[in-house]
Structures are given as structure tokens and as C-alpha cells.
Amino acid sequence: MENGKCNGATTVKLPEIKFTKLFINGQFIDAASGKTFETIDPRNGEVIATIAEGDKEDVDLAVNAARYAFDHGPWPRMTGFERAKLINKFADLIEENIEELAKLDAVDGGKLFQLGKYADIPATAGHFRYNAGAADKIHGETLKMTRQSLFGYTLKEPIGVVGNIIPWNFPSIMFATKVAPAMAAGCTMVVKPAEQTSLSALFYAHLSKEAGIPDGVLNIVTGFGSTAGAAIASHMDVDKVSFTGSTDVGRKIMQAAAASNLKKVSLELGGKSPLLIFNDADIDKAADLALLGCFYNKGEICVASSRVFVQEGIYDKVVEKLVEKAKDWTVGDPFDSTARQGPQVDKRQFEKILSYIEHGKNEGATLLTGGKAIGDKGYFIQPTIFADVTEDMKIYQDEIFGPVMSLMKFKTVEEGIKCANNTKYGLAAGILSQDIDLINTVSRSIKAGIIWVNCYFGFDLDCPYGGYKMSGNCRESGMDALDNYLQTKSVVMPLHNSPWM
């Protein structure tokens, strides 16, 4: 290991790139324009595949296929039980191809192969199984009408054609969190994966065909946000768009939806999540969770605990332990089983993170460890910790989306809560303490969609997550996610001579 980087030795065979075309109406086809774009291996900056570049014309074709499949096809007309069987078959095929999918996400996005193999891809299959289990349990309710002459009930119906726009940081899990509930609800869809990480989405399209998902239910248009993504957001025949990504892009999608057909919009956006470490926390565990919360997935995670607040009684000890442990946080080839952090997703993100690190230095924060790129090939960055960060600094305010931690001190519980809420975001937060009354007070006071107590990244298939404030307007995972793809219809009729009400 040199400068905190593993040697990258691996015996894993790299994946064969089999699918690079658009997937529309059950077929892999070239883009109408014939255009393609290159996808880059972030380990070395080299081209690994040339992928079809879809734009508005291709989105039109995909939406037409999805519309026909919804209006005339079998998918929304199947019983939930029948849909569930096909979705479970899809999950079976995902599990049979775990290694291949994990390899694709590793070479495409720099994700650790072991993480993909044992976490991301199994969780992807899990989301499809969870929603398959929900597909035959979608129902309305009988209403207790206030007017005795009326009988009413509600129906839950699929919303229609959905545009799902997927981010690059978790290309498999985010694919599943949107596609699985949409399928279970009976929707058809057009999916645009991030241009940086399109390979696994195309492989999932292939598996959906093998599973027997009817043509037109799942369509994949690879391409860029400014063209393909914008066409989905503004399309007059798309009934709903779901997006995970930056707050700035989410705002543009909402504007496009409003300017077109007022389609429903679900947004899961940026974060600048706080981790509050109180005086009674276990110092060793606190340091481990702080590093995990900030550096997991190379910091490219919307709920990263990038702002760490430590109560003054244990601040010095926590800082010492953080610096000590950060130096053992190995960075290297994602196929190296000893690596804990791979390369950033692409050159643009790599340069953005390094720019923020320079801002931190120039604005007066104290660099405790890291702060540099590693090597002269690929997009590797040292885990970086700043102390003496103040609320007016860019590294405090902005979502960096990289392995950069801002470390601050606080005195009282009230001050800690105020610091935690001092952000435009509200996606997640962590609390480390043994005091149940304090935990209850702080967890109720922080304005965030999910709070982790004495743990971090406590995700579960049944547990919804999403944002307050500028972190979004929806919840994903759990039964709440299914509601994103359903709409409620009320049916009312006269009722005469009822024996009781």
C-alpha cells in the first residue's frame, strides 16, 4: 500500500459488456440518431463501452411503447398475484446474476465489488421481492359516509406511464427502489439511468425480458439529462416522474412537469446530514460510525454524515481516534477485497471534490488528514477530515458528494440541535448517546426524514426514507414507496333502505 492506496491486486475476471443499446418495447435498438457516447472506467479513465445516446425522439418512442402497454397491454390488467409471480421471477434472475451485476457497477461507477456482491445486488433483488409481496395487497376502503343516503368506497389504481430517472451513486439499488414499486402497482415506465452508470440498467432490462415481463412495461433510454432526462420530465404523455439526484436538477424537473401536463413528481434530492456525538457515546464506536457515515461508497451517498458534531467533553478524544482510524481507511481498486473505498465516479466529480477541499483550506478550516488525490491514474481521493469548520464555509453548506468530513464542536443539547438543523437540507441524521430521553428529544427536534440512533445507514426494505426541506418531497422503500405510483379514486352511489349505517 502506498499513500493509503491498495495495490489493486485482484483475481476477479472483469465483466463482458453485453448490452449497450436502448431497450424499447422489449427490444435492444440503436438510438434514432445513431449517436453513441463513451462510458469510462473510473479506475483508470479508460473507455470500457460505447453506449447508445438516446434523446427526445427515442424518449417519444419509449413513452409510446409504455403508453400502449398501459392502455392496451396485460400488465395493469393482471391480478396482483399474477404480477407478483413475474416480479419474483425477475428477482430470481437478479440473484442468479449477482456477480455479473456487481462487476458492472464496479467498472462503471467505481463501486466496491464486494459491496455490490454482498449488499447492493442482494438488496436490489430484495426490493423486487418486497414489492412482489405487496402487489396483491393493494386495496381501497369502504367509506363511512356522513350522508346516510350515499354509499362510497375508494380504489387504488396505477398512476399510468412513469418516468424514472436514476442516479449514478447506487445504480442498482436506486433502479429497484423506483422500478419495483412501479411494477407492483401496475404501471409501465421509461427509465433513464445516469450516463455514468448505464450498464447494469441495461442488464436488468435483459433479465426482465427473460422473466416474462411484457414488452413495453420496462423501457430503458440511455443518454444525458439535458436531452433524454428533460424529454421525460416535459413529456405530455408521462403521468408521473420520479427522480433521485441533486436539488438543482430536481427543481428543473419540477418546473418542466408544471410547464407540461402537471404530472406528479417524486423527488429524492441532496443532503448535508449531521451526526451528533454526545458526551456519553462510546468513543471507539463513534469514530467508526463517523467514518462509515461519511466515507462509505467514497462519500457518494445522499445521506452521508458529512457534518459531524461532537460534544465538547469528548471532542479531543474523538478527533484523535478519527484521525488514527482514517489513516487505515484503504483506498484502491474496487475489485481488491482489502479496499474500503474505490475511485470517484468520473473525472468531473473527482475535480469537484478536490475543488471543495481547496475551498476548505482557503477558508480557514484545519485539515487533519487526507486532502489529496492518490496516484496519477483513475479518480482516487484520500479520505479527508477538516476541523474548525464554521457555518459560513462552503464545505459546511454544500453537498460535496465525496469523502470529505466537516468536524465541529458543540456544548449543549440545544446547540447541537440548532447546528444539525442549520442547513437547507433534511434527508438524514445520526445520534450517538445512551440517554433515551436525550435521544427522544433530539430525534423529534431534527428536521430530517430518517434518524439513525447509535447506528448509521440503517436501511431496510420496510423502512421509508426521504427528505424534509430541500431534500425532496417523497418517501422511498416500504409501503410508502408503493403509494408514489398509485392514485385514489372514489366511487359514490345512492343507498336506499339500508338496515343500518
UniProtKB/Swiss-Prot annotation:
Q: Tell me the enzyme class.
A: oxidoreductase
Q: Which Gene3D superfamilies match?
A: Aldehyde Dehydrogenase, Chain A, domain 1 (3.40.605.10), Aldehyde Dehydrogenase, Chain A, domain 2 (3.40.309.10)
CDD domains membership: ALDH_F2BC
Which GO MF terms are attached to this record? aldehyde dehydrogenase (NAD+) activity; coniferyl-aldehyde dehydrogenase [NAD(P)+] activity
User: According to its UniProt record, where is this protein located?
Assistant: Cytoplasm, Cytosol
Q: Does the keyword Cell membrane apply?
A: no
Does the UniProt entry include the keyword Cytoplasm?
Answer: yes
Q: Which PROSITE patterns match?
A: ALDEHYDE_DEHYDR_CYS (PS00070), ALDEHYDE_DEHYDR_GLU (PS00687)
- The active site is formed by E268 (proton acceptor), C302 (nucleophile)
Q: What is its main location?
A: cytoplasm
Looking at the UniProt record, the site noted as Transition state stabilizer sits at N169
- Record keywords, A-Z: Cytoplasm, NAD, Oxidoreductase
Listed EC numbers? 1.2.1.3
Alphabetically, which GO biological process terms does the record hold? Answer: phenylpropanoid biosynthetic process
According to the UniProt entry, the coiled-coil residues are: none
Annotated residues for binding of NAD(+) = G245, S246, T247, D248, V249, G250
**Reactions performed catalytically:** an aldehyde + NAD(+) + H2O = a carboxylate + NADH + 2 H(+)
Question: Cellular component per GO?
Answer: cytosol
Q: Which InterPro entries match?
A: Ald_DH/histidinol_DH, Ald_DH_C, Ald_DH_CS_CYS, Ald_DH_CS_GLU, Ald_DH_N, Aldehyde_DH_dom
Q: What family classification does the UniProt entry report for this protein?
A: Belongs to the aldehyde dehydrogenase family.
Main function: Involved in ferulic acid and sinapic acid biosynthesis by oxidation of conyferylaldehyde and sinapaldehyde, respectively. Can oxidize L-lactaldehyde. Possesses activity on acetaldehyde and glycolaldehyde in vitro.
Per UniProt, subunit arrangement is: Homotetramer.
Q: What is this protein called?
A: Aldehyde dehydrogenase family 2 member C4
Supply the gene name.
Answer: ALDH2C4
